[in-house]
């Protein structure tokens, strides 16, 4: 799901991710017998039952929880983590003033996928990322895989016309060192089942 980056005690920066795909992946892996630690932001979808759940709010909290969950055989990064946060979130609610707009200064959030992918010790055997794109989906996702250092990346087109962000279906392309494998549009549960089986096969 998303992360929430605070502006003040009542406002935050977020995105439209529901958490449905990540939740489905956790459920599918657990169904295959994996011991799953599910690190989740403030998602709309309740987490699967029977697995360890770690709830976080911000990107920095998600990084800390992810590192605490290691070591692991595989790490799957499906969360829609905010790229930026407000540099100095206010401790009190920002008041609206006539003719005035608050000036917000941003700074970059930690890159969780790249941090884990580039670990020199204790790196998971398989690191899987997601690339939510709106333009040049395959090219951008392929470049992201190389930049982040992950083993696989699942690319999807989240343009508004697709209905994927926040919807029940997904259409992904699995990008690995061997190339790109386009999957048909299917439910997020079906995507999760297919990915979970591929992960199990890769680790066997």
Kindly give the residue locations of the regions a language model identified:
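A glycine- and small/hydrophobic-rich beta-loop-beta segment
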Residues: 41-42, 46, 50-114, 118
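Structural beta-sheet core signal
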Residues: 38, 77, 127-129
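Glycine-rich phosphate/diphosphate-binding loop of Rossmann-like nucleotide-binding domains
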Residues: 1-58
């Amino acid at each position: 799901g998303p992360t929430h980056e605070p502006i003040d005690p009542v406002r935050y920066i977020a995105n439209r991710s529901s958490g449905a795909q990540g939740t489905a992946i956790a459920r599918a892996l657990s169904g295959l017998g994996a011991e799953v630690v599910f690190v989740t932001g403030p998602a709309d979808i309740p987490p699967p039952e029977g697995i360890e759940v770690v709830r976080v709010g911000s990107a920095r909290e998600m990084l800390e929880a992810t590192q605490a969950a290691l070591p692991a055989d595989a790490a799957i990064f499906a969360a829609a983590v905010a790229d930026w946060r407000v540099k100095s979130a206010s401790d009190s609610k920002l008041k609206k003033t006539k003719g005035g707009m608050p000036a917000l200064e941003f700074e970059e959030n930690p890159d969780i996928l790249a941090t884990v992918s580039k670990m020199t010790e204790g790196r998971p055997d398989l690191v899987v990322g997601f690339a939510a794109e709106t333009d040049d989906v395959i090219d951008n996702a392929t470049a992201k895989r190389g930049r982040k250092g992950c083993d696989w990346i699942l690319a999807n087109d989240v343009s508004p016309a697709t209905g994927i962000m926040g919807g029940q279906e997904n259409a992904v392309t699995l990008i690995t060192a061997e190339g790109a494998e386009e999957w048909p549009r299917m439910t997020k549960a079906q995507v999760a089942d297919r990915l979970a089986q591929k992960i199990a096969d890769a680790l066997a």
